[in-house]
Amino acid sequence: MLTMKDIIRDGHPTLRQKAAELELPLTKEEKETLIAMREFLVNSQDEEIAKRYGLRSGVGLAAPQINISKRMIAVLIPDDGSGKSYDYMLVNPKIVSHSVQEAYLPTGEGCLSVDDNVAGLVHRHNRITIKAKDIEGNDIQLRLKGYPAIVFQHEIDHLNGVMFYDHIDKNHPLQPHTDAVEV
């Protein structure tokens, strides 16, 4: 079981490296790692388990965050009342198209690898299309908008050595871009 001690923190060199593409089929160890990443998210969202093991709640985890420089992410976004939830373990995900319109979270973004609160708006594409493989090597294509699009972009950034705060405008950190939508 992964815990917070398995998650590397800001400043660790792996978080700034471009992660390696995975060859398919995945090895047994790679599959186990991806399943453990998803399990961390499930546990982190369970109040009792999170309290018992000191887990910070998360909706996404990228392999570089557990010091594995490979292009794998797990995303688990619970239903917010809209009837939609997102539960994916993706291999070699790529954003293949995106909107011009930007979106941002009014409270900014957080990260399991960043212990401090970083003030500032993170502008991302409001709509994206992702192509990836699932854990068994099957093709997946996702069209995402709003909050899920933001979460997936955050995790894919980790695969490219990019941290969320890299997107914050240093001169005007709390100023929304023109035409950007608040999510």
From Swiss-Prot:
Q: Which domain of life is it from?
A: Bacteria
Q: Which residues form the active site?
A: E155
Q: How is the cofactor bound?
A: Binds 1 Fe(2+) ion.
* Gene Ontology MF: a single term: peptide deformylase activity
Q: What class of enzyme is it?
A: hydrolase
Q: List its EC numbers.
A: 3.5.1.88
What does the entry list as the binding residues for Fe cation?
Answer: C111, H154, H158
Biological process annotations from GO: co-translational protein modification; translation
- Pfam families tied to this protein: Pep_deformylase (PF01327)
Question: By its UniProt entry, which SUPFAM superfamilies does this protein fall under?
Answer: Peptide deformylase
Q: Which cofactor does it need?
A: Fe(2+)
Catalytic activity entry = N-terminal N-formyl-L-methionyl-[peptide] + H2O = N-terminal L-methionyl-[peptide] + formate
Query: Which controlled-vocabulary keywords does the entry list?
Result: Hydrolase, Iron, Metal-binding, Protein biosynthesis
Family that this chain belongs to: Belongs to the polypeptide deformylase family.
- Per its database record, what is this protein's job? Removes the formyl group from the N-terminal Met of newly synthesized proteins. Requires at least a dipeptide for an efficient rate of reaction. N-terminal L-methionine is a prerequisite for activity but the enzyme has broad specificity at other positions.
> Cross-referenced PANTHER family, in alphabetical order?
PEPTIDE DEFORMYLASE, PEPTIDE DEFORMYLASE 2
Q: Which HAMAP family match?
A: Pep_deformylase (MF_00163)
- The protein, known as: Peptide deformylase
Q: What is the lineage of its organism?
A: Bacteria, Bacillati, Bacillota, Bacilli, Bacillales
- Encoding gene (name): def
